[in-house]
């Protein structure tokens, strides 16, 4: 009996999932369940290992394109589609938890709301959350993608959506692809410019959160707002 269970453990991840639960599986085993089969040359677990190695683990894999996936020997359109669909479902499930008028009472609340969506992005994304008078999220919008500087982040684009949504206040966020959320001089200058504009037009910029890899910095807590 122990021998059979050892085979299940090592070579049949789907059966192990049924016996022990999905939480007991490693990343390679979960990936193998999604792939279902290997190729003529290698088992499904070997194929899983190859994929994880190619993308340096889950961090890069979650944003893999169709072209990148099918470039791997043993991955065709069908397997690539299964993986991409699974990753998108995961992203949507994370969003579902917070989409019903999520209330932001602290920098921690804001970071929790956006962390999983932003921490793996490979380019800087500047995002604004538009809040009502109860600090509930009315809308969020990506203002631009690219390196942050004062010439790119124009207050007009930030506050235009605030007027459209009748927002009482704004929280700005952007990610550092390096994983280190330490603010740069440009980050601070952009923040001060937006705060000044908000004071003039009567829409408060509550904070600017920089997202790293499971870390964040609040420029309000740092004294820059």
From Swiss-Prot:
Q: What InterPro entries does this protein's entry cite?
A: MPN, RadC_JAB, RuvA_2-like, UPF0758, UPF0758_CS, UPF0758_N
Query: What are the BP-aspect GO terms?
Result: proteolysis
Q: Where is this motif: JAMM motif?
A: 174-187
Against SUPFAM superfamilies, the record matches this protein to:
JAB1/MPN domain, RuvA domain 2-like
Lineage, broadest ranks: Bacteria, Bacillati, Bacillota, Bacilli, Bacillales
Q: Which organism is it from?
A: Bacillus cereus (strain G9842)
GO MF term set: metal ion binding; metallopeptidase activity
Q: Would you tell me the protein name for this molecule? A: UPF0758 protein BCG9842_B0662
Where would I find the MPN domain in this sequence?
103-225
Does the keyword section mention Transcription regulation? no
What domain of life does the native source organism fall in? Bacteria
Q: Any idea which UniProt keywords this protein has? A: Hydrolase, Metal-binding, Metalloprotease, Protease, Zinc
Question: Where does the record locate the signal sequence feature?
Answer: none
Binding-site list for Zn(2+): 174, 176, 187
Q: Which family does it belong to?
A: Belongs to the UPF0758 family.
Q: Which residues form a coiled coil?
A: none
């Amino acid at each position: 009996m122990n021998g059979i269970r050892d085979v299940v453990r090592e070579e049949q991840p789907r059966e192990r999932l049924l016996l022990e639960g999905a939480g007991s599986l490693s990343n390679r085993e979960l990936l193998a369940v999604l792939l279902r089969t290997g190729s003529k040359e290698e088992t499904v677990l070997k194929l899983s290992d190859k994929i994880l190695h190619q993308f340096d683990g889950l961090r890069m894999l979650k944003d893999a394109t169709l072209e990148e996936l099918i470039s791997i020997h043993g991955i065709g359109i069908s397997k690539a589609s299964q993986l991409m669909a699974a990753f998108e479902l995961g992203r949507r499930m994370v969003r579902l938890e917070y989409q019903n008028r999520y209330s932001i009472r602290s920098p921690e609340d804001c970071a929790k709301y956006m962390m999983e969506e932003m921490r793996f992005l490979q380019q800087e994304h500047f995002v604004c959350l538009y809040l009502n008078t109860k600090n509930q999220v009315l809308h969020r919008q990506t203002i631009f993608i690219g390196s942050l500087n004062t010439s790119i982040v124009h207050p007009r684009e930030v506050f235009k959506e605030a007027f459209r949504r009748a927002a009482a206040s704004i929280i700005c966020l952007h990610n550092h692809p390096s994983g280190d959320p330490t603010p740069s001089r440009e980050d601070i200058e952009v923040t001060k410019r937006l705060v000044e504009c908000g004071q003039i037009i009567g829409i408060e910029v509550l904070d600017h959160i920089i997202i790293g890899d499971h870390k964040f910095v609040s420029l309000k807590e740092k004294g820059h707002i």
